[in-house]
Amino acid sequence: MKPEEFKQNVKDRVRVFEDGGIRLLKKGKRGIIRAIFGRTGLVLALFFVQVLLLLSVFRWFTALVPHLLGGSIAFTAVMVIYLLNSDMDNSAKITWLVVIALVPVLGVVLFWWTKGEVGHRMLKRRLKQLAQDTQEQLPQDAQTLERLKAQESGAASLAYYLRGKGGGFPVYENTAVTYFPSGEAKFAELLRQLEKAKQYIFLEYFIIDEGLMWGRVLEVLARKAAEGVHVRVMYDGTCEFTTLPRDYPKRLERLGITCKVFSPLMPFVSTHYNYRDHRKVLVIDGKVGFTGGVNLADEYINHVEKFGRWKDAAVMLEGEAVRSLTAIFLQMWDIAREPEFEAYLKQPIPAPAEAKGFAAPYGDCPLDGERVGELVYIDLLNRARKYIHIMTPYLILDGELETALKFAAERGVDVHLILPGKPDKRIPYALAKTHYAALIRSGVKISEWVPGFVHAKVFVVDDREAVVGTINLDYRSLYHHFEDAVWMVDAPCIPAIEDDFQRTLTQCRAVEATKQSIWQGQTLLRLTGRLVKAIAPLL
């Protein structure tokens, strides 16, 4: 169906714009104001009422503490001993010890409330079963693993982990990987690939916001749905508070698009809301897949400016490795239904002519006890010999990752991080800077991108390995979010990733291990970072 013909057919259901895109929302019917005065506002109001009621109960209970002081002290002492002997990250232990010391009763209750998995036990069991199903449906080709082992034994060990406890994701050959150094570059290719869809299109994104980017994508999706292509869209429930109305899935369904919202906002206090779907996955016919840092909103393609220029990165896969991206999408889509792996993962995928090297897309689930994203990063740091170059928007490190960064630099590896010169959030920006001095003194190089905000999540190592995905260097990504990434070995695109790092570096300010260089006279920011660092794992 031609675009002009399609727009004529749906003009009574959408607004058509000169940029070629379509919109479902009227101007002004979005954002924080809409959320406050709409159904989402009611949900939040009920949520805060519950919080106030819980705090009232805590206050009443705390009033009894003087009468039960001996028991309270003993209970707190038991909690301290429990924390010190737990397998929790040391930074998280310190945080909880601080909280319990400041508010003993409330702190203990909060700890057990979060540890008790209130609201997501069933989800945890379901995801565990889906992970087992994924491993059965994605067999590892033994010859591929042997060839990887012959080229790089350390990389083969990482592949073994990803195939096993890392979620059941194999390493593939017969896959071409294209690297995009900006959201604009990804957007242009994404539109071209969407036009080729014949069977299905799967989209899973953390953020969707109406504007030029989503409008152009939505026009193609709706047109393809009218042609009989099966289109599925899934986005994180936080969009209901920030960008989209609660009835947006129904609006998409009127265009023939099936839509789900991950963890929508509900008026119940639960730790379940702490786990967000931060993934950015697009799969077309099981043959082409995209992932990376780029969401479907205009700031990601610099059509609007929020924090100066926006620097991002993404990759496109063509070939066998797309199977894993398809599985990652289906894991989330099929949480409440029978999995559809058989229907979508058994189709033959032709190998692109230019396919070389190895690729392993993988997901990270915060509920399986495996910190896959962090362990992959640490493994790359430990195996680096010449250099490891990193782009990340945030730097809120636990002890293990900070030690790995320092140790790599102390071994003589060129460890270089590029972070934003203009932050999107002040508190994470302040927390990042609290790590600078210790890292720099160990030999780690840190640079800040002067033109604006770096949102890319990129590791490139020794001209041989790279990771591009959604996983930030902060607690939320490493512990609390559903994430995904692609690990590559000897892929032809790896020199392009390193070239992008070097080009970005030319617009950066080198940071030195001095108070003036790190904080640039921002005393309030420095105090904020020092104060908040004690509770960083909770942010």
Task: List each language-model region with its residue ranges.
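N-terminal localization/anchoring segments of enzymes in phospholipid and broader phosphate metabolism
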Residues: M1-L375, D379, R383, P423, ...
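Glycine- and other small-residue-rich loops at beta-strand/loop junctions that grip anionic moieties
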Residues: F206, P393-Y394, P428
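Thr-Gly-centered strand-to-loop micro-motif
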Residues: M391-T392, W449, V468-G469
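Helical hairpin unit composed of two closely spaced alpha helices linked by a short loop
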Residues: Y394-H416, P420, K425
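Short glycine/threonine-rich loop-to-helix capping motif typified by GTGT followed
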Residues: T403, Y429-K433
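Catalytic-core elements of nucleic-acid end-processing and repair enzymes
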Residues: K457
